[in-house]
Amino acid sequence: MFTLAEVASLNDIQPTYRILKPWWDVFMDYLAVVMLMVAIFAGTMQLTKDQVVCLPVLPSPANSKAHTPPGNADITTEVPRMETATHQDQNGQTTTNDVAFGTSAVTPDIPLQATHPHAESTLPNQEAKKEKRDPTGRKTNLDFQQYVFINQMCYHLALPWYSKYFPYLALIHTIILMVSSNFWFKYPKTCSKVEHFVSILGKCFESPWTTKALSETACEDSEENKQRITGAQTLPKHVSTSSDEGSPSASTPMINKTGFKFSAEKPVIEVPSMTILDKKDGEQAKALFEKVRKFRAHVEDSDLIYKLYVVQTLIKTAKFIFILCYTANFVNAISFEHVCKPKVEHLTGYEVFECTHNMAYMLKKLLISYISIICVYGFICLYTLFWLFRIPLKEYSFEKVREESSFSDIPDVKNDFAFLLHMVDQYDQLYSKRFGVFLSEVSENKLREISLNHEWTFEKLRQHVSRNAQDKQELHLFMLSGVPDAVFDLTDLDVLKLELIPEAKIPAKISQMTNLQELHLCHCPAKVEQTAFSFLRDHLRCLHVKFTDVAEIPAWVYLLKNLRELYLIGNLNSENNKMIGLESLRELRHLKILHVKSNLTKVPSNITDVAPHLTKLVIHNDGTKLLVLNSLKKMMNVAELELQNCELERIPHAIFSLSNLQELDLKSNNIRTIEEIISFQHLKRLTCLKLWHNKIVAIPPSITHVKNLESLYFSNNKLESLPTAVFSLQKLRCLDVSYNNISTIPIEIGLLQNLQHLHITGNKVDILPKQLFKCVKLRTLNLGQNCIASLPEKISQLTQLTQLELKGNCLDRLPAQLGQCRMLKKSGLVVEDQLFDTLPLEVKEALNQDVNVPFANGI
């Protein structure tokens, strides 16, 4: 036999799951326990006390002799007297042998003493008293075993089946209801989600960050109220400062909120301070944010928990209706008296028996109690169904939490996640409020901000400040959760680089950085406060923005009216959005340099907004063919133009309209012919032409018309010779024809009296003409990776030479006349070590002498 505790364990759940048990589930659990007790009590009573006692229905007295077995009349008349006789036991107590229906008829062949053991002691007493009693009751002439047989037969035939099986049915129904109530806690696919949810919910509820976030919200509200009250008064109140020191306060939001703190002397405005969480608590809180984010993504995908709860509620309701329908019909069927016709007349001599059921009254009361309990249970099930279908439980809104707190970004959730939160609200709404804190990105960012400021102190940031190539103080922050507050205390910083900081916020404190003129935002769509924007608008001179999509460019970038240089690096023409473009640049009134590295198919028309004052335009197109360049015609004030990696095949005609153009760079295109170069004669200010890294095979003679050229770059092309027209450019100072197929240097090179830099590296030159050394102003002469066999002694005429490259040639020695190149030092001489060793000792010593030595001696 099982105990109540063993069966009731079906209704047990983990204590932590109680937060998901609304009042109706708890009430139904208790009702189920009561029904279980009723069923077990009824079953126990039935097993131990249940009896049916039957008596035959005797014929009328006139016919009684007809039913008396012949030859036994005398004996049977004496048996009743003997059966009701009394005797005293050894202790002197009087007992009565009550076996009215348990004796059998005595036959003449069997002694009376053998049939009744007590007759030996009772008969002498009876004979002594000589009392003769008349028989009482009516004779049935049935044996004890016959009565037992009849009782058993009538128990199964005359007794209604429900009277016999009610306890077992009640037990089975109750167990089914218990299992149905808690099946969603046991089913693996839902149990795992519920377990994770309860675990995360408990940690969120106990997290110090939840308490701190809620207290900061309350503090913010009180600060705002204080500001409104203070603003309405003409005179400041003198408030003790001790009460404000212990209260937590929120960090500065996007629109700066400052709290007021008054001293006894005068009111002082202060930014509320922030208490730093313990490092361990901060790490745990950050882990909770990650867990909540992953759990939400996992649970919101399905509504299995909701459907299972609805199904089990429907099952319980159907079970209630079924139980109520068939049990109500059997209440009146349970009675104390029953008429039994077992058809055993051939065994007992009687056809009809009158029976009594001793448990009838108890079973009837228990059944009525069970029906009453199941009715209450059913009404609760109906209420549960009403609640399930009246409210959209697959949607949960944190609107009330958003109104009561500063976390207005707490998202609404759906499906199983929403249903679980609705269930928690039936237990305690405070759980959902605290849980919502971990769904807020604002809350997570605040936590990151606290941890970040705790980790990146002023001293640590000072250690990361370095000097860049322009000798400016530079700080580079990479892959942080935000911008530490201590950064804005580095007032002497010139350059600030923020890379891969998606939640970067620039507060008003940046106005302290009076030396800041250059800002780099690499995949960092920074947000700025109004005060910070005003400072950047007036002081920022150079801005670098690197992005993946044009949407990552902060909107405030286009409003920096004092910006001088803007560098945009990213995708401005993605495959999914062909119409992507820059916003209006009209507000950039002082922009001088615009650098765009992207994949444009046409020059953005918005660039014309800055045409009146733009002096340098750079477009690096990363191999995407630039088809439309008509907008360039409007860039009348551009002095420097770079169109690199634009897959240009010819020099664009739009360039010839740029009358103020001084430098043109068409690097890394697909230009093969430059016959249009004659049109450059109209660009009177053009001094530098860079056509390097193309596929040019020849320089047309018409280049001689571009008389103002001072720098000419044709490196990394396919030139095989240099036309004499090049050497008619008397103003030429730099000529770069490196990495071509040039085999000879024309003697006309001596005409370039102003030539200072000559680069012929990576060609096939084997002889250096003597006329080359007439270019006495040469400072750089790169002759590496050629076929030169000897270096003429006239190298001594190049007294201003500071760099000479000879590495990769066929030289076997160096002339001693190198010593007469007084400006040339070993650091500027690029040659093999064995060739350097061929120089005389005094020449090597002269080359090894530091240029700064004479100046050092003179100090």
Swiss-Prot record:
Residues 1-22, 184-309, 388-859 are cytoplasmic. GO terms for cellular component: cytoplasm; endoplasmic reticulum membrane; membrane; monoatomic ion channel complex; plasma membrane. Residues 127-138 have a biased composition (Basic and acidic residues). Residues 228-252 have a biased composition (Polar residues). GO terms for biological process: aspartate transmembrane transport; cellular response to osmotic stress; intracellular glucose homeostasis; monoatomic anion transmembrane transport; protein hexamerization; taurine transmembrane transport. LRR repeats lie at residues 515-535, 539-560, 562-583, 590-610, 613-633, 637-658, 660-681, 685-706, 708-729, 731-752, 754-775, 777-798, 800-821. The modification Phosphoserine is found at residues 242-243, 247. The keyword Transmembrane helix applies. It catalyses: chloride(in) = chloride(out); iodide(out) = iodide(in); taurine(out) = taurine(in). Residues 49-164, 332-361 are extracellular. One of its GO terms (molecular function) is volume-sensitive anion channel activity. It is a multi-pass membrane protein. Residues 110-138, 222-252 are annotated as: Disordered. The keyword Amino-acid biosynthesis does not apply. Disulfide bonds join 54-355. SMART domains: LRR_SD22, LRR_TYP. Non-essential component of the volume-regulated anion channel (VRAC, also named VSOAC channel), an anion channel required to maintain a constant cell volume in response to extracellular or intracellular osmotic changes. The VRAC channel conducts iodide better than chloride and can also conduct organic osmolytes like taurine. Plays a redundant role in the efflux of amino acids, such as aspartate, in response to osmotic stress family member (LRRC8B, LRRC8C, LRRC8D or LRRC8E); channel characteristics depend on the precise subunit composition. The volume-regulated anion channel (VRAC) channel forms a trimer of dimers, with symmetry mismatch between the pore-forming domain and the cytosolic LRR repeats, a topology similar to gap junction proteins. Belongs to the LRRC8 family. This is Volume-regulated anion channel subunit LRRC8D. The lineage of its organism: Eukaryota, Metazoa, Chordata, Craniata, Vertebrata. The gene is Lrrc8d.
